[in-house]
């Protein structure tokens, strides 16, 4: 949003040397040892050990469903009937006539004891670089380069959550080719993947 930063962005892109693989991820580790467990796990333990505090938002779940995103079961639990259902803002959770939960909660996988806290990642870097090339920020606009970085970023994002390689291949193959859409739509797809990737991150 600050045009004066474009040149600096271009210089960094040309220089390289930034986060370039999962081994470079900035991660705060937790373990299964008491006193060193993920605070999200400890929060759920404080309220009885059942995760019914945090639900799937339709603003996240629906775009993932539209794209057949393989991260859905990593992010959310299905309802008691096996269906993934998100909630709108201020919408109450849905149950069946036996009080079984039908609305999807955030997955126990994300609330496990030793779930690491991801601070900055390879996929975040790749998607930011894809955005820069799609917008022409400090570099010539290049949707082919943006597409390459976008696909790599999505692969890394899925792999971080343990999605099987075959499922990643299927998903990435089905994503739009950014070279075949308008620059505006290319940016939309990049931003959507950034949004999905940051689901389990704090607002800051």
What are the functions of these language-model segments?
Residues 5-129, 134-135, 141-197, 203:
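Hydrophobic-face positions in mid-chain alpha helices that act as interaction patches
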């Amino acid at each position: 949003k600050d045009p004066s930063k474009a040149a600096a962005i271009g210089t960094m892109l040309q220089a390289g040397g930034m986060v370039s693989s999962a081994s470079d991820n900035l991660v705060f580790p937790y373990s299964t040892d008491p006193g060193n467990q993920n605070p999200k796990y400890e929060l759920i333990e404080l309220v009885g050990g059942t995760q019914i505090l945090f639900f799937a938002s339709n603003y996240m779940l629906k775009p993932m469903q539209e794209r057949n995103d393989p991260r859905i079961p990593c992010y959310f639990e299905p309802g008691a009937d096996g269906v993934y259902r998100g909630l709108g803002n201020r919408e109450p959770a849905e149950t069946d006539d036996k009080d079984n939960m039908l609305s999807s909660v955030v997955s126990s996988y994300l609330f496990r004891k030793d779930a690491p806290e991801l601070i900055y990642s390879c996929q975040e870097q790749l998607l930011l670089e894809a955005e820069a090339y799609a917008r022409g920020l400090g570099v010539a606009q290049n949707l082919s380069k943006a597409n390459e970085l976008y696909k790599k970023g999505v692969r890394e994002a899925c792999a971080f959550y343990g999605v099987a390689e075959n499922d990643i291949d299927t998903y990435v193959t089905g994503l739009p080719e950014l070279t075949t859409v308008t620059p505006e739509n290319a940016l939309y797809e990049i931003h959507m993947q950034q949004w999905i990737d940051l689901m389990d991150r704090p607002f800051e």
